[in-house]
């Protein structure tokens, strides 16, 4: 059994990091491994380390932990580097969004057709894209045999950028494909009898194959839409897989949008809050409305505070068990949800659903498994350039990643009217980043339906570049 070093960048993300640690503990083939946690927020880093060590102690696993605030330390001697960091955090994203809205760009300039996800900035996110490249180059220099696992948004732009510019082993991961299981559950189907396949780009994947008991399962979905869709109500802002927006997109494109693809629709569904409510449901109007995103940010803030609270309690009460947290927490909904998450990771028979650790296990121990991965196209999806990263199912084993044949192929409408326009925006973002040509960002905004004048474009870009966090970005774009 190989013991490996796994580095996690942005380890202050509480739930994600704990899920990875729990999956490691439930993977015998990775016993004895070292996990290096890296974050620039030392308080959050210490909290995660405290809880992770308690978890490992409680389940009796053989894992070693290191912590660092230095990027080199997390990469040196690493076999796998998982990046989930967001440079500037949500504070920076909100600053840019507010500037955009000040000049008439509802939900900010990075909210673009087919890319409406509120933390998926591509044009004003120079610092994030540069960080991806910096990490990749350090891997090339310090641990050239290591795998780079991209988990931080924007995964589409980020993984494409890294695979084009730095010769390392890189793959991107998301969990939007689990939207298929939501459909399966809603239709009352037995999961083991479902044959499914998705294909597209990150946050732009489509259910090209949907079969049940050997037959086409789409008529079952059509029946549900006809008989039950009118009664659909969202349970939370992210609950949109069977929303009116998803169904409307399905009717136009011919196959079902999956996961965050539903959020990444056209302006028809996103013009304003009332429009969002119509298509994504009351009361939030989806995850990316001003109401839905505030719900998400508030939830994140509560999770961070709960994590610190739990870590403090563990330090003060070393004999406490994580399974007893319900007696400490559980006072409000967020704390109850945190307790439920802990109960899930304590279940020895249950993996988290994150793909990263099973992927590592498949590569190292030849435990063959199916994953949905973000990798360069290389002919997988017809009509898309080879060096564009696509999101597709693949078998992974000790010999690497083996993408499935996309069968049946994606409909022409998906490729021509959805994927190619989305890819064009990715290409514009990457060319702007790589060349420093500010005219590309201006051109994007000239085409934006929210733009009413050239002056509007000049002013919004000028104010975004003037942010203190964007000093390097400003120099990069104004050097020409």
Curated annotation (Swiss-Prot):
- Which lineage ranks, top first, belong to the organism behind this chain? Bacteria, Thermotogati, Thermotogota, Thermotogae, Thermotogales
- What is this enzyme's catalytic activity, as reactions? Hydrolysis of terminal, non-reducing (1->4)-linked alpha-D-glucose residues with release of alpha-D-glucose
Task: Kindly list the cysteine pairs connected by disulfide bridges.
Answer: none
Q: What does the annotation record about activity and temperature?
A: Optimum temperature is 90 degrees Celsius. Active from 60 to 105 degrees Celsius. Highly thermostable.
NCBIfam families attached to this UniProt entry: alpha_gluc_AglA (NF041089)
Record-level GO cellular component terms: cytosol
Q: What class of enzyme is it?
A: hydrolase
Q: How does it assemble?
A: Homodimer.
What is the annotated role of this protein in its UniProt record?
Alpha-glycosidase with a very broad specificity. Hydrolyzes maltose and other small maltooligosaccharides but is inactive against the polymeric substrate starch. Does not cleave beta-glycosidic bonds.
Q: Which UniProt keywords apply?
A: Carbohydrate metabolism, Cobalt, Glycosidase, Hydrolase, Manganese, Metal-binding, NAD, Nickel
Q: Where is the active site?
A: 175 (proton donor), 260 (proton acceptor)
Protein name from the UniProt record = Alpha-glucosidase
**EC no.?**
3.2.1.20
InterPro entries associated with the record: Alpha-glycosidase (IPR053487), GH4_Enzyme_sf (IPR053715), GlycHydrolase_4_CS (IPR019802), Glyco_hydro_4 (IPR001088), Glyco_hydro_4_C (IPR022616), Lactate_DH/Glyco_Ohase_4_C (IPR015955), NAD(P)-bd_dom_sf (IPR036291)
Q: Name one Pfam family in it.
A: Glyco_hydro_4
Record the organism.
Thermotoga maritima (strain ATCC 43589 / DSM 3109 / JCM 10099 / NBRC 100826 / MSB8)
